Amino acid sequence: MKIPAMMSLLLVSVGLRDGVQVQSYSISQLDIFSQETPLDMAPASFDDQYAGCLADMTAALPDLNHSEFQANKVYADGWAQANNQWQERRAWGSVWGSLPPSPPGFRDEHGVALLAYTANSPLHKEFNAAVREAGRSRAHYLHHFSFKTLHFLLTEALQLLRSHRSRGCQQVYRGVHGLRFRPAGPGATVRLGGFASASLKNVAAQQFGEDTFFGIWTCLGAPIRGYSFFPEEEEVLIPPFETFQVINTSRPTQGPARIYLRALGKRSTYNCEYIKEKKCRSGPCWLGSSAPGSISASCSLLLLLLFLVLSALPENPGLQQLTRC
């Protein structure tokens, strides 16, 4: 959506004010047509990083992708469009030149996934809406999230592109239409909740929204210019698990809310959920915790009970093997 000239002037002229501006403001066109929503840690977001299961997920993709095509027409159509574009670019290049050198491990599926996400189609909107809700429970992800393949491929693609990048963190800009975000205030820790498109160019980001405008210092986002349907936008894609600190915000009477974020790190609730479920269907298994590196509640309770029992018995080396969990 193109921003009217007056709105562009507002975006340029609105300065960063100290602290959160709390005031009563008059109803404007933005207030009528935009929705206000909190900017927080997005607890319902599906944030799997696939740590330790990249090879297993890659092996599972053919069957998984086929089943998701059948269940999700928007995804199937978007993928077909992107695949045609990818094959065309591989054969002939594009009006912006040939494909960029790909990092080691980058496959055709990664390129198609990035093209599908950036295409002018309903896919990216439906996908991100589903990502923001799929983490409400493990069962919801397994049984109701029909974008598992796309989520994995985008996550891995960003990891590969980021590792291939010469510089680390970078300043990007993000414009949002239809939502006025409300952070808790300076110092709060937040996540963007889905795969967030931003741009290296301030002006390009302004074209995408007039309700909230972000200035973001990201360390996990990766430039995807060479894999986008619209390379001139200089897009940087930020994964849903990157965490940020709110540096400052402003809420002018008219014009966009402005929010400035600085990268903190990453945080995930889930890890390798599809592979855990797949392995459990084929035989007995222990799932443990979704969060990598943590101990499950059942294991902790078992260890406590065994400790109490063993402490009341004479020392027996054979019993020590029971404490493994």
Curated annotation (Swiss-Prot):
Q: What class of enzyme is it?
A: transferase
Which keywords annotate this record? Disulfide bond, Glycoprotein, Glycosyltransferase, GPI-anchor, Lipoprotein, Membrane, NAD, NADP, Nucleotidyltransferase, Sarcoplasmic reticulum, Signal, Transferase
Task: List residues traversing the bilayer.
Answer: none
GO MF, one term, reads: NAD+-protein-arginine ADP-ribosyltransferase activity
Q: Where is the lipid attached (GPI-anchor amidated serine)?
A: S290
Q: What does this protein do?
A: Has ADP-ribosyltransferase activity toward GLP1R.
Please report the name of this protein according to its UniProt entry: GPI-linked NAD(P)(+)--arginine ADP-ribosyltransferase 1
**Lineage, uppermost ranks:** Eukaryota, Metazoa, Chordata, Craniata, Vertebrata
Task: State which gene encodes it.
Answer: Art1
